[in-house]
């Protein structure tokens, strides 16, 4: 079974959810994009590379747009006022077992879990204090 499937990127209680769907898979880079116009789309990319004889490296990127419109010649056009970029690299030794990798995923989920220090600092647009 493929894991290159659509998923909910932003869970906002149902109505404001942002779903991203597979859009491209070239040169080993999987890309998911939301259904918004390209200029306003959320985008996720993920690639897996052999970074050394002993390690496999995952590179994950997420683009979050600030959705806005711009009037050009009397026509409102969709634009992104700005974008926020997340870049994450994860290196896993090639001899890690599946259960080791499941534990790594649990650590990633805990890192970004609602209410924990890092997402709280980001959501409040502040630092760690």
UniProtKB/Swiss-Prot annotation:
**Where are the annotated segments for Viral RNA-binding?**
31-104
Which keywords are on file for this protein? Capsid protein, Repressor, RNA-binding, T=3 icosahedral capsid protein, Translation regulation, Virion
The places in or outside the cell where this protein is found are: Virion
Query: Is Repressor a UniProt keyword of this protein?
Result: yes
Q: Give GO MF terms, alphabetically.
A: RNA binding; structural molecule activity
What domain of life does the native source organism fall in? Viruses
Where does it primarily localize? virion
Gene Ontology, cellular component aspect = T=3 icosahedral viral capsid
Similarity comment: Belongs to the Leviviricetes capsid protein family.
Q: What does this protein do?
A: Capsid protein self-assembles to form an icosahedral capsid with a T=3 symmetry, about 26 nm in diameter, and consisting of 89 capsid proteins dimers (178 capsid proteins). Involved in viral genome encapsidation through the interaction between a capsid protein dimer and the multiple packaging signals present in the RNA genome. The capsid also contains 1 copy of the A2 maturation protein. Acts as a translational repressor of viral replicase synthesis late in infection. This latter function is the result of capsid protein interaction with an RNA hairpin which contains the replicase ribosome-binding site.
Kindly provide the name given to this protein in its UniProt entry: Capsid protein
